[in-house]
A protein has these predicted regions:
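C-terminal functional module detector
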Residues: 2-189
């Protein structure tokens, strides 16, 4: 949506840049660090201002890594994952104040070059845990969840996504759907 051609209020089907979808990069305010953040996955995207901050920290064996970093740990170790999102109380561009309904922790195996370069998905990728309000704690606008990935025996990546809705998996939007009622956020591995 950042390549806006014609706004929906003018008969088009698009939004102004940053009005609906936003990309956040964890970086100091310099061109070089922003590019470094993009290259190394210190990024999350959100629609409709569902969230305004996201932190992911993994810990094992006295070591820790944050979003976009790698964690080295002994095979078979338990890895503690802590996810913090800011669920802002402020209204978005549509005048609504969406609420996070669910956060998904996704994991997949890192196995090297893909055997099928045409495949659009990693067959090992799966939802490790779905969190709802019953599973998290709040600290003001922040939602915090933790989960232990037990007995990891190989290289893996994690991703985080969340929604303000009830769909288990994102699906294509039907024609005429209100985009402000189908909000998601995604974090890079």
């Amino acid at each position: 949506t950042s390549d806006s051609h014609r706004h929906y209020t003018e008969g088009g089907s698009d939004f102004w840049p940053g009005e609906y979808s936003k990309t956040y990069v964890k970086a100091v305010p310099s061109h070089a660090d922003i590019l470094d953040g993009l290259r190394h996955g210190r990024v999350f995207v959100t629609t409709g201002d569902l969230i305004s901050e996201l932190d992911v920290v993994v810990q094992a064996g006295g070591r820790r890594a944050e979003i976009g970093e790698a964690l080295q740990f002994a095979r078979g170790s338990d890895v503690l994952v802590t996810i913090r999102v800011r669920d802002p109380d402020a209204a978005n561009a549509a005048g609504r104040t969406p609420q996070v309904a669910r956060i998904d922790l996704i994991i997949g195996d890192v196995t090297g070059p893909a055997a099928d370069r045409e495949a659009a998905a990693n067959p090992t990728t799966r939802v490790a845990r779905r969190f709802t309000a019953e599973d998290w704690r709040r600290n003001g606008e922040d939602i915090i969840v933790t989960h232990t990935l037990s007995g990891l025996t190989g290289d893996a990546y994690i991703r985080v996504r969340g929604t303000g809705g009830t769909e288990l998996e994102p699906s294509p939007d039907p024609a005429g759907e209100d985009p402000w009622s189908d909000l998601w956020f995604y974090a890079n591995p």
